[in-house]
Amino acid sequence: MAQRAQRSLEAAKKAVPEGTFAVGIGLAVTGITTYAFFVACARGLSEKDYAAVIGGLWPLVFVVAPGCFLPLEQEIGRALAHRRSQNIGGGPVVRRAAIAALWGTGGLLLLTAIFSGVLRENLFKGVGGLVICFAIALLTYAAQHLPRGPLSGNGRFGPYGVILGAEGCIRLLPAAILWFAGVTDPVAYGLCLAIPPVLASLLSLRGQHGLVEPGPQSPWSELSTNLGYLLSGSVLAQGLSYAPILIATVLATSTQHAEVAAFVSGFFLARVPIILFQAVQAALLPKLARLAGAGEHEDFRNGLRKLVLIVIGVGVIGVVGALVLGPWAVQLFFDKAISGGELAMLAAGSGAFILALTLAQALIALMGHAKATVSWAIGIAVGAIALVALSAADVELFLRVELAFLLACLGCAAVMAVLLVRQMRAGVPAQSVERLLAGIEHEPLEI
């Protein structure tokens, strides 16, 4: 009996991927500090400026920056991990990635300059300084995602977790000071968002050596495996996740600043299940990896079904919680008023998005990159059609945004489910699950 218990304990330890706890702590810290940052902005800014910073700048940054740079980070980590397994230095890979990041950032900055007027008037409520904040954020997030790849690829998940947690803390501290000091300039709060990524990176890289070792020359193909599909899918997924507040901010009239501010606060409150979702993944996915690695494919399929059921359960809890406690929480923390029905709709959309994200990551793990990207595109098309139809029917702005978001996420999930079932019939190789773990455990969804 004692030997059996010892074997079970050793198996449990092996089942937990290296760095899970470090990254988990970083995620927890950044989650808490992010919501505290939202509270500071809600309390310190006018409703118009709050809508501009949190309803305009924040989602735009987190659609474009992670959408464009996270796939590059993932490919760096994958390539370096492969080289490390063969005792080959990855310096040339990182240099290739730096060149790609430089060109990509330059292109994004050029587009920002071209469309600066559109951004200022439609998303930033006439605050031109927020365009500068957005440009700074592109630079700092490019500078952050570039070292995150070598940290992940070299198994340095402690410093990786430090980046996640430190960014949230560095962002919150000056914002809290601005709030308590009575500063109401939205650009000041925008800089609190734009600058911290590079500071967090510098902090995490202190004392790190051997991240970029010399090695054989790296062809572009070593870095660009499925990069196009990863990039497209990442941008589409991040864009869909923030679509409700981006659309509401753009379509709202000048007399709806208070409603937009309340909607933005409710939207982020409804995203709390995403944090619970990541905790569930951290607990269950290692077990799935062990089952697949042992060739127990039927057990793997059963485990994946359980994961989907748990995701649905988390979504249901989120909807009920939003309906019952949501209005009270929004009033308490953000000093905004929003109905439980609206919050429940937003929570339902977030739950459907989580389900779609889970299925997308499983598809990618089974080398279904193109299928995942196409699924995101189809779902977004469904949402766009729904939004146009609801607008033609003169449905109230926020309700049509909520319904379109929900339908888009459900559309993505439905298409992915069909494609995933077909993909799994061909078998579940163990290396696919390793890719799934790498994609979820160490490449978290950007809040």
Residues covered by each model-derived region:
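Interhelical loop/hinge segments that connect adjacent transmembrane helices in multipass membrane
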Residues: 2-14, 158-162, 182, 186-192, ...
